[in-house]
Amino acid sequence: MASTASEIIAFMVSISGWVLVSSTLPTDYWKVSTIDGTVITTATYWANLWKACVTDSTGVSNCKDFPSMLALDGYIQACRGLMIAAVSLGFFGSIFALFGMKCTKVGGSDKAKAKIACLAGIVFILSGLCSMTGCSLYANKITTEFFDPLFVEQKYELGAALFIGWAGASLCIIGGVIFCFSISDNNKTPRYTYNGATSVMSSRTKYHGGEDFKTTNPSKQFDKNAYV
């Protein structure tokens, strides 16, 4: 029962993390222009993995998609690949988890389901690591430019998508670890105490002993009468 409960908790935590990681891809605010050192702000610049936008003081936004993948900076291409890999791994981890959980009717025997659940945990951990690496790489680029005194272009701050990605990655890793530890509970063999033999023997001696006594007494009496 404890193993089933831990698997359900791990599944809910992992799915929540995967949903958060998936929501970072369409999120606009991966980085937002800083207002540090500016007196008058006429526009706000922000960008994600797919486009760069600017919002003026009236609230009108103009966006421009990145024209060519090969013309992009290397860190953006790496973040794209890592985040897409994280979402894909989380999807397959969810499928493996459904087959490996003991509360489901698919997956075969308990031993086979335990192995599938452990595999789901490993996949979720990899998904979390990919998301954590992608968000950290993007954040490292932002902070490096922000604290560089020789960088004269527009400086940015960390956007909300990075924090969502870090939170989702942490949940995926935690859920994956719980899935991996659940296999140890499934491999534990229960101990049985056998007390039936003593009770059976005592009952046999109780009921059959009297019958043997009754059947032997007439024969002894007959032998005595035969010699009189």
UniProtKB/Swiss-Prot annotation:
Upon changing K64 to W/M, the result is: Hinders formation of tight junction strands. A small fraction of these mutants is integrated into tight junction network resulting in increased permeability for monovalent cations
Q: Superkingdom of this entry's organism?
A: Eukaryota
Tell me the Gene Ontology biological-process terms attached to this UniProt entry.
bicellular tight junction assembly; calcium-independent cell-cell adhesion via plasma membrane cell-adhesion molecules; cell adhesion; monoatomic ion transport; paracellular transport; regulation of monoatomic ion transport
Tissue-level expression reads: Expressed in the kidney, eccrine sweat glands and in all layers of the epidermis. In the kidney, it is detected in the thick ascending limb of Henle's loop (TAL). In the sweat glands, it is expressed in cells from secretory portions, corresponding to the clear cells.
Check the record and name the InterPro entries matching this protein.
Answer: Claudin, Claudin10, Claudin_CS, PMP22/EMP/MP20/Claudin
Q: Name one GO cellular component term.
A: bicellular tight junction
Extracellular domain ranges by topology: 22-80, 137-160
TM annotation in the entry: 1-21, 81-101, 116-136, 161-181
Per the record's keyword annotation, is Oxidoreductase included, yes or no? no
What Pfam families does this protein map onto? PMP22_Claudin (PF00822)
For this protein, what reaction is catalysed? NH4(+)(in) = NH4(+)(out); methylamine(out) = methylamine(in)
Q: Which residues lie on this side of the membrane: Cytoplasmic?
A: 102-115, 182-228
**Gene Ontology MF term list:** identical protein binding; paracellular tight junction channel activity; structural molecule activity
The alphabetical list of record keywords is:
Cell junction, Cell membrane, Disease variant, Ichthyosis, Ion transport, Membrane, Tight junction, Transmembrane, Transmembrane helix, Transport
What Gene3D superfamilies does its record include?
Answer: 1.20.140.150
Q: What is known of its domains?
A: The fourth transmembrane region (161-181) is necessary for integration into tight junctions.
Q: Which disease is it linked to?
A: HELIX syndrome: An autosomal recessive disease characterized by congenital heat intolerance, generalized anhidrosis, inability to produce tears, dry mouth, electrolyte imbalance, and ichthyosis.
Assembly state and interactors? Can form homodimers both in trans (interaction between CLDN10 molecules in opposing membranes) and in cis (interaction between CLDN10 molecules within one membrane).
Per the record, the similarity remark reads: Belongs to the claudin family.
Briefly state the protein's biological role. Forms paracellular channels: polymerizes in tight junction strands with cation- and anion-selective channels through the strands, conveying epithelial permeability in a process known as paracellular tight junction permeability.
The protein's matches in PANTHER family, at most eight in alphabetical order, are given as: CLAUDIN (PTHR12002)
Instruction: Please report the name of this protein according to its UniProt entry.
Output: Claudin-10
Q: Identify the gene encoding this protein.
A: CLDN10
